Amino acid sequence: MKICRYKNPHLKGLPPRLGVIYNGQIIDPHLNFVAEYEREGLFNPWERAEVKCPSSLSKILSLYEKPFETIEEGFAIALFNEKIGELETTQGVPLFYPLDSDTSPITSPLDSIHSFRDFFCYEGHAKKAFKGSIPKEWYQGPTYFRQSHQNFIGHKDTIFWPSLTKKLDFEAELGVVIGLEGRNIKEHNAKNHIFGFTIINDISARDIQKKEWP
């Protein structure tokens, strides 16, 4: 399942929302719960849907030990709504949006990031960096940089070039999103704490970096 956040053109003034990418479109799980509750005639369908499946991915991760179950339920409701031709709420808000559209653009995947660690490199990369001789300390624990968790931007957003650098570089990296909190996690239990994976462009000022870390 591919999860994203997107800007909803019909809910202006509200933050980007949780979406599921499927079959060339963005499905909004929260809105599909709204449509389901409206169909059932339940009171306060929008509020009920926000409790069941929040429009914020970070909120879902903080509330549920198994967040995928809630998202998958909303996805299943969306497929049913599409099958019966129910494509919007009673207020006229669509349940489905075109992918890669200027009207409903994808943003950064998480709305609230509490901690970001940029790990040094893979073993193969480390061998090249240390010219074949990796220090034993490298194997004793993960080596990482403490990065700012407030400087994430989204798909197709503009990367601003700081005036202090003349050598701005980027690296495509694998991002691991932690869903379930923990401490002193054993290797065989690690996957239970991983919510998903994403692709990150790590932007570096190489000339500044060289001065700070020769």
What is each stretch, according to the model?
Residues 1-142:
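N-terminal non-catalytic cap/leader segment that marks the start of a structured domain
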Residues 105-214:
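Glycine-enriched loop-and-adjacent helix/strand subsegments that border the catalytic/binding cleft
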